[in-house]
Design a protein with these regions (language model features):
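A short helix-loop
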Residues: 1-49, 158
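Cytochrome P450 heme-binding "Cys pocket" and the immediately downstream C-terminal segment
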Residues: 146-168
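Residue-level recognition of short, structured coil/turn motifs
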Residues: 6-10, 97, 124, 149
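Short, hydrophobic alpha-helical segments
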Residues: 5, 89, 144-149
């Protein structure tokens, strides 16, 4: 989406020396929850029995550039993704009877407070963002520490090393 529709924002971000997603999130935060009714369907909840995939679509928008613009569509993408996470949590709960009490939002997407808040609102769960966003590298370091005896358990290693930046 960024590369296909947000060239002006990419140029502005480069000029300002900021991440383009900061600009997109700032504008999308001004769009009300529900994106004025715009429905994004870029993905669908996994169907493991009949492997299907939704065709990417936007529906229920009007030709009104004040309300229905690239920031509305961007927010609708974030909302769609949050709904997918909720759907997958429900699938796991239906299959196992268990669901997480909270979600950890790591990686590049965790740099978006807007997306983390949307995820918390849609899933009705606390979303925690770690200080170290690259969870794979941090997890590898924790496992290495456990492997050489630095930590008595993996859980203890995680408890000592993982620090939380923000909770939504």
């Amino acid at each position: 989406y960024r590369d296909g529709f947000c060239q002006a924002e990419k140029a502005e971000a480069e000029k300002l020396g900021v991440d383009v997603y900061n600009l997109l999130n700032e504008k999308a935060a001004q769009v009300p929850a529900g994106s004025y009714g715009t429905i994004c369907c870029f993905r669908d909840v996994m169907n493991y029995i009949h492997w299907t995939h939704a065709s990417p679509t936007f529906t229920n928008f009007e030709l009104d550039p004040e309300r229905f613009n690239k920031y509305t569509f961007y927010r609708a993408i974030l909302e769609n993704t949050a709904l997918l996470v909720r759907g997958h949590i429900e699938l796991v709960k239906d299959a196992t009877g268990n669901e997480p009490d909270e979600l950890v939002f790591a990686g590049g997407a965790s740099k978006s407070p807007l997306w983390a808040q949307i995820l918390a609102d849609v899933c009705h769960k606390r979303v925690r963002v770690p200080q170290v966003k690259e969870a794979t590298a941090l997890g590898s370091a924790i496992l290495a520490g456990y492997g050489v005896g630095l930590y008595p358990s993996i859980a203890e290693g995680a408890h000592r090393v993982v620090k939380w930046e923000q909770t939504f």
